């Protein structure tokens, strides 16, 4: 019986923490604007007049984007650096995030990205638009 009281108290504390967190979202301005989140939620068929829920989705989205960017950076750092012969270029150690790095990071989250065909790789490049078979 004591176990039931403890779990009830823990549930009450969780509910109170959730209520407090949702209330704090009213004073928070997320990185991703409310209008943008509302647009994509509506596009997916979700309508909600509660700003707190929209901001909760914005915070979750922001965290997802930050996690993917961090993972992509780790993939970028793990990639072998190209051999540079010029001493000036050796001092410049900027990392270049590639689509391959981003694809690997997204794949860890179950998102498969197809690389778009480059315009220059298209068989119809340089052809008259009227004669293209695309």
Curated annotation (Swiss-Prot):
Major site of localization recorded for this protein? nucleus
GO aspect biological process, one term: DNA-templated transcription initiation
Q: In which tissues is it expressed?
A: Expressed in roots, stems, leaves and inflorescences. Expressed preferentially in the vascular bundles and bundle sheath cells of cotyledons, the phloem of hypocotyls and the central cylinders of roots.
Classification via InterPro entries: TAF10 (IPR003923)
Compartments, record wording: Nucleus
Cellular component terms per the entry's GO annotation: nucleus
Record's note on what induces expression = Up-regulated by auxin and cytokinin.
Record's keyword annotation contains Nucleus: yes
Keyword entries, A-Z: Activator, Nucleus, Transcription, Transcription regulation
Q: Which family does it belong to?
A: Belongs to the TAF10 family.
Q: What else is known?
A: Overexpression of TAF10 results in salt tolerance during seed germination while knock-down mutants are more sensitive to osmotic stress and display several abnormal phenotypes involved in meristem activity and leaf development.
Biological role: TAFs are components of the transcription factor IID (TFIID) complex that is essential for mediating regulation of RNA polymerase transcription. Involved in osmotic stress adaptation during the germination stage and in gene expression related to meristem activity and leaf development.
Instruction: Fill in the subunit field for this protein.
Output: Component of the TFIID complex. TFIID is composed of TATA binding protein (TBP) and a number of TBP-associated factors (TAFs) whose MWs range from 14-217 kDa. Can homodimerize. Interacts with TAF4, TAF4B, TAF8, TAF9, TAF12B and TAF13.
Q: What is this protein called?
A: Transcription initiation factor TFIID subunit 10
Q: Which organism is it from?
A: Arabidopsis thaliana
Gene this chain is encoded by: TAF10
């Amino acid at each position: 019986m004591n176990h039931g009281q403890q779990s009830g108290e823990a549930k009450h504390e969780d509910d109170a923490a959730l209520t407090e967190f949702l209330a704090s979202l009213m004073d928070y301005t997320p990185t991703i604007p409310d209008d943008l989140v509302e647009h994509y939620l509506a596009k997916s068929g979700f309508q909600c007049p509660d700003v707190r829920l929209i901001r909760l989705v914005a915070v979750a989205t922001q965290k997802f984007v930050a996690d993917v960017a961090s993972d992509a950076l780790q993939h970028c750092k793990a990639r072998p650096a190209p051999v540079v012969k010029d001493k000036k270029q050796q001092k410049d150690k900027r990392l270049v995030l590639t689509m391959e790095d981003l694809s690997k990071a997204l794949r860890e989250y179950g998102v498969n990205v197809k690389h778009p065909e480059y315009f220059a790789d298209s068989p119809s490049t340089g052809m008259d638009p009227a004669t293209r078979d695309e």
